[in-house]
Amino acid sequence: IIGLDMAVPQYYDSMDINIPLMKLASWAAYMGVIRLIPGISESDAVKYGTLSDEEKEVYKVVFYSRTATVTMINETKSVKENAEKVNKMGVPQLPILLFISDGSGGTGFDKETWRKIPIEYISQVDDGKYIELDCPHYVHDYEYETISERIREFLSSQ
């Protein structure tokens, strides 16, 4: 298992999920109002990733038409319950490599807490490793070369 700043079940214990705000965002997207909010479609993928200009435009079109959909809201409503189900299954004893961000970029956690939770999780795995990255949550937009290199090293050691 290779996790790019993945959310382990313990994150959801204290995560505050604002469903009314998501429903408001859904309405704003449906009505097209979301397009009037400056910079809202300027995600890390657009600002820092490797997308071409054409791909950035496609990203924005998809973002505006598929933001806060009913499916996304339903998934969010179920996420804590689903995390508890996963937690009850226990930590898998498989080779796991976690890339851990600094928690910035919308996680809702401070750096220390964001890093502490997956480090505690991976410490329960016999063949578990982690790499801390000094970048926001969407690590693949910032550290894709490091991630690629370290994944290759990890896989070749298995």
Regions found by a protein language model. Name each.
Residues L36:
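Active-site microenvironments that recognize anionic phosphate/pyrophosphate groups
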Residues A7-P9, D102-G105, P136-Y138:
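Short, solvent-exposed loop/turn segments at secondary-structure junctions
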Residues I2-G32:
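Flexible "cap/lid" loop of the alpha/beta hydrolase fold
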Residues Q10, V79-N82, F154:
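Phosphate/oxyanion-binding loops and surfaces in catalytic or ligand/nucleic-acid-binding neighborhoods
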Residues Y12-D13, N18, G108-D110, Y142:
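Short glycine-/acidic-enriched loop or helix-start segments at secondary-structure transitions
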Residues I40-L51, K56:
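Helix-loop "lid/cap" segments that line or gate small-molecule binding pockets
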Residues S123-Q158:
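Catalytic active-site module of serine/aspartate enzymes centered on a nucleophile-bearing elbow/loop
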